[in-house]
């Protein structure tokens, strides 16, 4: 399981505005495809796009960690109900992944493969 954020390292405002995918985004997909090729193991890729409330920094590098670890209340930000739901969803995905090797039993997060380079978006 690996991912990147919308305003991650080396991303310009123009890239975000145009929807251009970054080298990190593309690298996650390439890494996933290579893992499948070499070891036959599925990989799950995510793209975090939620703009955190409280400033205009957007979905900066590591912004997803508050959600992923369920630590929203340890931060000064004025979280909204949507943030709490997103954090709960992400915690469920990560916990299920640790238990089973896949983030869900359902079809809402597919493995990223050469045939289907699926990327789960969190917004």
Identify the residue ranges that each predicted region occupies.
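C-terminal helix-and-tail extensions that cap enzymatic domains
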Residues: 2-123
């Amino acid at each position: 399981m690996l991912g990147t954020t919308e305003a991650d390292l080396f991303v310009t405002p123009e890239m975000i505005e145009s929807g251009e995918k970054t080298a990190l985004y593309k690298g996650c997909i390439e890494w996933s495809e290579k893992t499948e090729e070499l070891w036959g193991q599925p990989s799950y890729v995510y793209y975090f796009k939620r703009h955190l409330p409280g400033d205009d920094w957007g979905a900066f590098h590591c912004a997803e960690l508050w959600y992923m670890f369920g630590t929203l209340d340890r931060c000064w930000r004025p979280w909204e109900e949507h943030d709490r739901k997103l954090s709960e969803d992400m915690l469920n995905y990560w916990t299920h992944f640790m238990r089973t090797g896949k983030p869900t039993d359902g079809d809402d997060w597919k493995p990223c493969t050469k045939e289907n380079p699926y990327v789960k978006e969190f917004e």
